[in-house]
Amino acid sequence: MHRVMGIETEYGISVPHQPNANAMAASSQVVNAYAPIGAPAQRQARWDFEEENPLRDARGFEVAREAADPSQLTDEDLGLANVILTNGARLYVDHAHPEYSTPEVTNPRDAVLWDKAGERIMAEAARRAADLPMGWTIQLYKNNTDNKGASYGCHENYLMNRSTPFADIVRHLIPFFVTRQVFCGAGRVGIGADGRGEGFQLSQRADFFEVEVGLETTLKRPIINTRDEPHADPEKYRRLHVIIGDANMSEIATYLKLGTTALVLAMIEDGFLSQDFSVESPVGALRAVSHDPTLRYQLRLHDGRRLTAVQLQMEYLEQARKYVEDRFGTDVDDMTRDVLDRWETTLVRLADDPMQLSRDLDWVAKLSILEGYRQRENLPWSAHKLQLVDLQYHDVRPDRGLYNRLVARGRMNLLVDEAAVRTAMHEPPNDTRAYFRGRCLAKFGAEIAAASWDSVIFDLPGRDSLQRVPTLEPLRGTRAHVGDLLDRCRSATELVAALTGGR
């Protein structure tokens, strides 16, 4: 399994005992508190917005700037806290939330690793913010809703071939996204956008989606987002921007979320999926699946069949197994085989008894905890205490978050070890352009004026103009490609000269 991918997560933020606290200011405090550790240079490189265009639509048009909602204008430098880290990630303020965007990785296990590093970075940032003079105590949550009507995102990004028809992506992904929440939902107490409805549901995001396809990410949220901003060579690539996922604490859930999606994308790119799994009323189906933790709800397909979400996922799994056998035979890599096996085992257990997966999946682990409280204290789902337990599950503090306490007690299955997570807080992946970005920031940070996913801009002594080094190929700038060069160059001037042939 080899596909460039990444995760960007907006964290929930709370300032206890400060009812008038400004979320934007608190988020900036968090980001700025971590900057001296995450980017320890004499100057802080700014984010390079030049190549960003959030209003370009994959359906072949561009939204007029004056017609766009201000929340869509993510290419404007508003002067908010924004740090590029030595691990190749971005830590910044987005929509009044601190956001961590992982560096580009090439497989779901590495996505888990650098995503988990983001949790540790956020916990450390909040701790350091509290230690500042006049600093607030700030609590961060890796969740998706405040249960007051607001939702904030955990977005996935996948590099795809530009030649893949977008209509095929829409047709095959909508049923998959409607149903994958059975294993990657984070679980939520409350029904409806404001959470006032009584009950428990699989997904934190399902109630906030309104349309099937669209450009927006905060208004009229679509199941398929059409933003066409590849952050790479636009002639060769598109970046599929997936906004429908929950923020997962579980490493297994994150791994399955990205691994299964990557397999489905491979089938779409290769034109392998001939069956049409389209469901009727996808937005309504998305919510109906989420609202039924018994997993018995049956979706109606366009071909007349009725299937549960687990059964429809089994259909995708069967196609994926056929695809892998057809394309690779016995020469399949270990991670692809592992994703397929875990996908199947998970679906079989969900069909038998979901509670068997309390060590693997967030929604099941959370439901197990909540049912314990309900039985001991005879609590209805409307009890405020249950919403507090729900929230505490996502607390990123190692000693306070319920998920982290389950891990400490050996009650959650893991994929990556803590030593690797700690390393990933500071070191970039070796096999994408994030390696070049991160190593440049670590070694030549004082001479980097700006950077982005697709460029690093140097401010060299004796040069009147800034020197832009484009990084439009996500699989160049790797350790194998530039590692020796970076080790050999003693200055940024020497590096840029080597890259440009001395121009």
Swiss-Prot record:
This is Depupylase. It comes from Acidothermus cellulolyticus (strain ATCC 43068 / DSM 8971 / 11B). Changing R400E: Abolishes depupylation. Changing H155A: Abolishes depupylation but not deamidation activity. Displays depupylase (DPUP) activity, removing conjugated Pup from target proteins; is thus involved in the recycling of Pup and may function similarly to deubiquitinases (DUBs) in eukaryotes to prevent or promote proteasomal degradation of certain proteins. Is also able to catalyze the deamidation of the C-terminal glutamine to glutamate in a variant of the prokaryotic ubiquitin-like protein Pup; however, since Pup from A.cellulolyticus possesses a C-terminal glutamate, this deamidase activity may be of no significance in vivo. The active site is at D94 (proton acceptor). It comes from the Bacteria. Its cofactor is ATP. ATP binds at S101, T102, N157, R239. InterPro entries: Pup_deamidase, Pup_ligase/deamidase. One of its GO terms (molecular function) is ATP binding. GO terms for biological process: modification-dependent protein catabolic process; proteasomal protein catabolic process; protein pupylation. ATP is required for the deamidation and depupylation reactions but is not hydrolyzed during the reactions. Likely interacts with the C-terminal half of the prokaryotic ubiquitin-like protein Pup. Signal peptide: none annotated.
